[in-house]
Amino acid sequence: MRSFLRYFSSVKEATQFRFESCRVENKSYIRLLGPDSIKFLNGLVTSKLQPNFVKKNLTTISTKEQEKNNTLSSLNFSKYNWGIYKECTRLEDHISRFGTYTGFLNMKGKLLTDSIIYPYPFTLKSIQDKKFPEYLMEFDSHIAQKMERTLDNHKLLSKVKFKHVQNEELRTWDAYITMPEEYQLLENLLNPMQEMKDGEQALHFANFFASMFFQGNEHKLKAVYFDTRLIDDMYEGKIKPMFRIVTDNSVSDINDIFNCTAFGENPFEKANISATEIQKERFKFGLFDGNHEYIPETLLALEANFDYFEDSINSDKGCYVGQELTARTFATGVLKKRCVGITIDEPQKLADWDHSKYLSIFSKLELQVQNQDTQAAINPFGSLSKPVKKRTRPAGQLINYNGNIGVAVVRKDYIYHALKHHHDIDAYVELPNKETVACSIKLEWLDRFLEETEAEEVEQEQ
């Protein structure tokens, strides 16, 4: 917390402060509360929402790790509105009041829907103002009732209550908060955030964030999610810091309640952006926002890159719906496809696609390899049969698109080849009428898979 305060008290004069926002129209919420809330959710989603500690030999555990275990294990997760536990890959494990991006799987391990789980409400006077933990679960509006039935089917004897929040009660917004690079917004937001080890600390941080950026309107903020799915890309400046903000229905434009004078002589410029712009930015990096963007139960969570996200999936959390295949994939490392962004040369040709099935993507690289492999089959009676041409395997499938940017699930061997030989993947989408549309997977959008590629190459050499 001290570093966060120190940062905001030492900002120098600048002009590149921007707050850009967009209304998100298709979201609905289910409100969940009760002493078993976290235990209940932990058995349904891919994120690890409560810590479990394995006893270790005292000579193998560090003092720092032991202190962290002692602090987190002493928390009572069934009492008061303490927030949400985040077990991270790059950040330290911590308690937060910012939401968690997660997934609900079917019994076969396929993604039913992605979701955001928010501690609710975002700000309070004290965590003891509420007797039990309380959360909002965000879903696309068209599946909210189905997910409510799913929750009801799994409730059994769990001490939880949930109900669908009427759509007119809440409003959802996407917002970018950007500042000049020298002010290190990410470091000074994430560093103090990961220091929060109990509910009161997390609440103090949330209250400070709300008063800094929404002074005088803190009570209108009901939930906040800081999109940390691709932290490394944010640090490299490829992705702008994105926030999903849920307000009450009194807010007609979130720009009106944003505190543009938070830094005194450095006022924020405020602007509205379109949902199209935001979706295209996400698609570049293979990111989804609700199952209206893909066909439910067609993707594995790891194919959707959940293992690259900060706190969205965990390999050792124990039992949850769909856990068996996911755990096996983690253990064996056998995963054949990944979701990536693509560029599309003539997107108007896709206008009649009804999205009921993914469209096959073929790569010119595959055709070259297969043409070399085509050979005559040997006839045991002495004559040669006609050459047998292998069936061309798709390099991947187009999942969705917006204008000239799409998101596709692509075979990893193509991704690895592109990274190894430093080239884009030139390909084409095949329409149902066999017409083709040229597309390309940009090398710059594949950087995050480089370490995975190198690790698998080492394993193959051994």
Swiss-Prot record:
Q: Where is it chiefly localized? A: mitochondrion
What subcellular locations does the record give? Mitochondrion matrix
Gene Ontology MF terms in the entry:
transferase activity
Q: Look up the transit peptide and give its residue range.
A: 1-15
- GO biological process assignments: iron-sulfur cluster assembly
GO annotations of cellular component type:
mitochondrial matrix
Alphabetized UniProt keyword annotations: Mitochondrion, Transit peptide
Which PANTHER family does this entry report, sorted A to Z? TRANSFERASE CAF17, MITOCHONDRIAL-RELATED
Q: Which family does it belong to?
A: Belongs to the GcvT family. CAF17/IBA57 subfamily.
- From the Swiss-Prot or TrEMBL record, give the protein name: Iron-sulfur cluster assembly factor IBA57 homolog, mitochondrial
